[in-house]
Amino acid sequence: NLVQFSYLIQCANHGKRPTWHYMDYGCYCGAGGSGTPVDELDRCCKIHDDCYDEAGKKGCFPKMSAYDYYCGENGPYCRNIKKKCLRFVCDCDVEAAFCFAKAPYNNANWNIDTKKRCQ
């Protein structure tokens, strides 16, 4: 779910950037999304959005699905999840968290005018 996803982000980036920095970034980080991603981090958000869309097509509820995960020194991972939907959603979130941690953060792409830049 979205709360767990925020913890996974913090785990993957070792607390270097607050989760709220990703809530209004580029064209895809945050609610909705359209156009071409503005950079690598925004592409991570689009991939995560697409993953959640795929989860929805499978009958899952990604924004509300609670799963078991662990935050280790090498980052987050999904723990012993047998239910397919929960595993799928957890994998979406873990992959995105690592993607966020690797991607550079460009302050100029935070809180952009999406009507102009995301067509």
Curated annotation (Swiss-Prot):
Which positions form S-S bridges? 11-71, 27-118, 29-45, 44-99, 51-92, 60-85, 78-90
Question: Which of this chain's residues are annotated to bind Ca(2+)?
Answer: 28, 30, 32, 49
Quote the cofactor binding remark.
Binds 1 Ca(2+) ion.
Gene Ontology biological process: arachidonate secretion; lipid catabolic process; phospholipid metabolic process
Q: In which tissues is it expressed?
A: Expressed by the venom gland.
For this protein, the record's Pfam families field holds: Phospholip_A2_1
Q: Which SMART domains match?
A: PA2c (SM00085)
The active site of this protein is located at 48, 93
Reactions mediated catalytically: a 1,2-diacyl-sn-glycero-3-phosphocholine + H2O = a 1-acyl-sn-glycero-3-phosphocholine + a fatty acid + H(+)
Q: Supply the Gene3D superfamilies for this chain.
A: Phospholipase A2 domain
Name the keywords, alphabetized: Calcium, Disulfide bond, Hydrolase, Lipid degradation, Lipid metabolism, Metal-binding, Myotoxin, Neurotoxin, Presynaptic neurotoxin, Secreted, Toxin
Task: Write down the required cofactor(s).
Answer: Ca(2+)
**Biological function:** Snake venom phospholipase A2 (PLA2) that inhibits neuromuscular transmission by blocking acetylcholine release from the nerve termini. Is directly toxic to skeletal muscle upon local application in vivo (dystrophic effect). Also has direct nephrotoxicity in experimental mice; a single subcutaneous dose (1.38 ug/kg) produces renal tubular and glomerular damage within 24 hours. PLA2 catalyzes the calcium-dependent hydrolysis of the 2-acyl groups in 3-sn-phosphoglycerides.
Q: What is this protein called?
A: Basic phospholipase A2 notexin
